[in-house]
Amino acid sequence: MVNIKEKLFVYLHDPPDKALKIENHEERSKKILSSGNIQYSRTDKVKQADALSSKTQRFIIRTKENKEPVIDFLGRSSGKYFHVGYPVFIHPISTEIKRYETLEKYIDLGRSNRGERFVNEFLERVSKLEGDVLKEVFEDASNKFKGEESKQWAYIWQFYPVKLKEGVKEFAKSELKLKEEEAEKFAEEFVNLPADTRFPDHAIWTHLDLTSALSVKDPTLLRIKIVPVQPFIANSRKQLDLWASSHLLSMLMYKALEVIVDKFGPEHVIYPSLRDQPFFLKFYLGENIGDEILVANLPNKALAIVSGKEAEKIEEEIKKRIRDFLLQLYREAVDWAVENGVVKVDRSEKDSMLKEAYLKIVREYFTVSITWVSLSEKEDIYQVTENAGLSDEDVKKWLKFAEKKENSRVLERIAIYPLLVKILDSLGERKVTEERFEKSEQLKGWKCHVCGENLAIFGDMYDHDNLKSLWLDEEPLCPMCLIKRYYPVWIRSKTGQKIRFESVVDVALLYKNWRKIFDEKYGKDLVSKAREVSEDFVKDNMLVDSDLYYSSTWESGLSKKLKNKKEIDEEKVKEVVDFLNAAYKEIGNPPKYYAILVMDGDDMGKVISGEVLGEISTRIHPNIRDYVEIPEAKYYSTPQVHVAISQALANFSIREVRSVVKDEGLLIYAGGDDVLAILPVDKALEVAYKIRKEFGKSFENGSLLPGWKLSAGILIVHYKHPLYDALEKARDLLNNKAKNVPGKDTLAIGLLKRSGSYYISLVGWELIRVFYNSELRKKLLEEKGGVGKRFIYHVLREVDTWPKVGIDEMLKFEVIRHIRGRNKEETKELREKIYGEIKDLLEHVRGNNEVEKVRGLFTFLKIITDAEVFP
C-alpha cells in the first residue's frame, strides 16, 4: 500500500515552479516539502525514475563555453547556464505553440522596475505559497481519510494542483494587485508550466506523475481490457438499458483501476487520466459532483505502470474485484425484481434465481484480460522491433538516434515505449481470444428476450408460455439483462442522481420544445383524461410513458401499459384521441424521429504512438534548436506525451462534451475520443459540430484539449425502430462510411425512414457552418421560389445520367429551372447566389468524382428537409 511521505518526496523531487528558474530548483523542492515535515532526498528511487524517464526524450545538447542553454523566466545567464528564451508550451498533438503571456508580462514589468533581484524575490514568495498549500491539502487529506494512506495520497494528488491554482490566483490579486481576469490567467499559466522547457510538450504535473510511477521496483507497463463491449451495449431494448450498459462498463473499469490506485496511487494510471475523473472523485474520494457521475466516461481499455513483482497479484485482484461486484449487483437485482414485481415469484422462491447456473453467467460474461511487460529490462531494441514486425525505415532512423545517444543498442524497453504499447496490445488481444474461448457452455433452455444470448432466469425450468407469464411485460431476462434493469436504481441509491431522459421518446419530444409547449397548454388535461382511462397511466401527476403523447399509442397497444389486465372504456380512450388530435392542430404533430450521434477520434492509435505527429524538431523549443542535435526522423511518442494526451482527452470528454450536450439530449458515453449521445433531430448537427470544434482545439483556458480530427455518424430514425438496429446502423455510418474516407474528419449522416427508405451523405464539418449561413438553407426552409423538395428530387433523380464533363452546366440548368424570384432582377440575383453557394458546399462533400459529390450534397439536403434538422 501507499506510504504517503515517501510518495511526496518522490513526487515533489521537482517543484511545480521549476520552469520559472531552472538553477537551484531542487532547493525550492526542499522548502516545499519541509512544510509537510518531509525531508527531501534524491534517493535511488528518484534517480532511477528520472533516468528511465530521460531515456524517452533523446536529444544531445551542444555546449557553449562549457555551459548549457536554459529556458526559464529568470531571463539571464547564471552559473553553468546561458539563457536563450522564455518557456513556451508545445501541444503534444497539434504542435501549436502557446506562450505564457501573463507571466511574461508580469515578470518583465517587475524586472524593469526592480532589477534582476525581482525574480528571486518573487520565487521566494511563490515557494512559500506552494509549501503552505501543500500543508493545507496534507492536513485536509489526513482529517478526511484517517488511517487510509492510499486515499490520503489520492486526495493530495487530485487537489494539490487545484488548491495551488486557487492560492496563486489570490496571491496575484492581493500581493501582485492583478485584476480578476488577469489573476485567473496568471494562475492558469502558473499551474501549467512545462516540465522540460527544452522539450515542452508536457506539463510539470505529467513529469511528476510519471517519475512517481516509474519509481516502483521493476516498473512494468500493464494493460487491462474488458470485453465484450459493443454486443453488451447493443443488446439494449430501451434507452435506459443503453445508458445502463455503457455506465456499467465504465463502473467495471473503475473497479479495475481502483486496485491500482489502492496499491500504487492514481498517478500510476497512464490511460485514462484519473485527475478530475468523475468516477474517481465520487467513488474513491467521496466528492459530491452532482449529475456528472451519470455520464459513462471510462473506456474498456487502460494502461498503468505497476511493480513487476506485483503484476500477477494485481491481475488476480482486479478479476476478483470485478467478479465480486457483479455477483453482489446480481443478488441485489434479484431482491429488487422480486420486491417490485419484475418477476412474479414468492420470496420463498427467490433462492432459485441464485442457483449456480445463473451465477456462472454473471461470473463468466465479461472477460478481463490483463497483460504486462517490463519497462526497465534491457534488450536489443532493434531485435525487439524486428520480432514484433514493427520495424520500418522511420522506426530504424528513430532507433539509430537512441542508440547514438546511449552509445548502445541494448537499452531499457521504455526507450521504445510507443512500440511497446503496440506489442502489449497484440499480446492482450491474443489473450482475450484465448480466455473467451475457454468459457463453459450454459444450460439448455429458453433464452433472454432482450439479448437472445444468455439463458433466461427460469428458462431451464418452465415451458415458454409459463416462463413469459412470470415476467413483467412477458419479457424473460437473463442475469446480465436483469442487472441492466436494476443498475439505474443502484446508481441512484449510491449517488442520489437519476437520468433525465429514460426513453428515446423523451428525447424525440424535445424537438423544437414540442413537449414543453404541449405541457404548458394541455398537460394537466391530458393527465386527467389518462387517469380516467386507467390509474396505471399516471404516476406522480405525470404520464408513466412519454409515448402516451402520441394518439397512435392510445389507438393501439394500450394493454401492455396496464399493470392489471382489465377492460378499458373505449369511449374514454376515444376522448383522449380526439383531445390529442385537436391539440396537434394547434401546435403541430408530436415529433417521431430522434438522432443517434456516435463520434470517434481519427487514427488515435497512431496519434498515441506518434506515427502521425510529424518530425522530432517540431517538439523542441524554437530558441534551442541550434543547440541540440535533432534526428531527421518521425516523432515517436513518449510516456510523458501519452500521459499528456490522456489528460487532453479527459478534459475534452469530461468537461467540453458535457458542456456542449447539456440539456439538449442524453449523453450516454464520453470517454477519451469516443462519444455516444441521443439527441432531438433539430440539435443533432449543431451538437456534433460544436463537439468537433472543441476536439480540434489545442487549448481552452490554459487546459489541454486534443487538437486533432474527429469523425462521426448521425442516424435519424423513427422512435419505434428497434434500438439495437439503430445503434448498429449509427456505428456503421461512423466505422464503415466516415472512417473509410481518405483523411477522414468526416460526418456520415443517415435518415432511416419508417417506410424503410435509407439515405446517406458524407460531408466535411465545414459544410455545416457554410450551409447554416446560406441563402439556400433559408429558401429550403421557407419552401419559396421553387427552392425545395422538387429541386432536390429532380437533381437526385437525374444526376447519374449527367455527362461527366458537364456537371457545372447541368447544375446551372437545374438552378434556372427551379429558382424564381419576385421579379426578373431578383430571380437573376437569387440564381447566381444559390448556384455559388452550391459550388461552395460541394467543396465540403466527400466523393470520388463530381457526380458523387453532387449526389452527396443533394442527399444531405434531402435529409435536412425531410427530417427538418435545422430549427
From Swiss-Prot:
Domain (GGDEF) ranges: 592-752
- Record keyword Transcription regulation present: no
What cofactor requirement does the entry state? Answer: Ca(2+); Mn(2+); Zn(2+)
Q: Which GO terms describe its biological process?
A: defense response to virus
The UniProt record gives the binding positions of Mn(2+) 3 as D600, D673, D674
At which positions is Mn(2+) 4 bound?
E656, E694, E700
Binding-site list for Zn(2+): C448, C451, C478, C481
What transmembrane ranges does the database entry give?
Answer: none
According to the record, the residues making up region (Not required for target RNA cleavage) are 1-215
Which annotated residues bind Mn(2+) 1?
H13, D14
Q: How is the cofactor bound?
A: Binds 2 Ca(2+) per subunit, this may not be the physiological cation.
Q: Name one Pfam family in it.
A: Cas10-Cmr2_palm2
Query: Its GO CC terms?
Result: cytoplasm
Tell me the domain of life.
Archaea
Q: Which GO terms of the molecular function aspect are on file? A: metal ion binding; nucleotide binding; RNA binding
Binding annotation for Mn(2+) 2: D14, H25
Which cell locations does it reside in?
Answer: Cytoplasm
Report keywords, A-Z: Antiviral defense, Cytoplasm, Manganese, Metal-binding, Nucleotide-binding, RNA-binding, Zinc
Recorded hits in InterPro entries, A to Z, give: Cas10-Cmr2_palm2, Cas10/Csm1_subtype-III-A, Cmr2-like_C, Cmr2_hel_dom1, Cmr2_N, Cmr2_Zn-bd, CRISPR-assoc_Cmr2_N, CRISPR-assoc_prot_Cmr2
**Quaternary data:** Part of the type III-B Cmr ribonucleoprotein (RNP) complex, an elongated RNP with Cmr2 and Cmr3 as the base, with Cmr4 and Cmr5 forming a helical core along the mature crRNA (39 or 45 nt in length), while the complex is capped by Cmr6 and Cmr1. The 5' end of the crRNA is bound to Cmr2 and Cmr3, while Cmr6 and a Cmr1 subunit (Cmr1-1 or Cmr1-2) cap the 3' end of the crRNA.
* Family membership noted in the UniProt record: Belongs to the CRISPR system Cmr2 family.
Q: Which PANTHER family match?
A: CRISPR SYSTEM SINGLE-STRAND-SPECIFIC DEOXYRIBONUCLEASE CAS10/CSM1 (SUBTYPE III-A) (PTHR36528), CRISPR SYSTEM SINGLE-STRAND-SPECIFIC DEOXYRIBONUCLEASE CAS10_CSM1 (SUBTYPE III-A) (PTHR36528:SF1)
Quote the function comment for this protein: CRISPR (clustered regularly interspaced short palindromic repeat), is an adaptive immune system that provides protection against mobile genetic elements (viruses, transposable elements and conjugative plasmids). CRISPR clusters contain sequences complementary to antecedent mobile elements and target invading nucleic acids. CRISPR clusters are transcribed and processed into CRISPR RNA (crRNA), formerly called psiRNA (prokaryotic silencing) in this organism.
Descriptive protein name: CRISPR system Cmr subunit Cmr2
Q: Which organism is it from?
A: Pyrococcus furiosus (strain ATCC 43587 / DSM 3638 / JCM 8422 / Vc1)
Q: Give the gene name.
A: cmr2
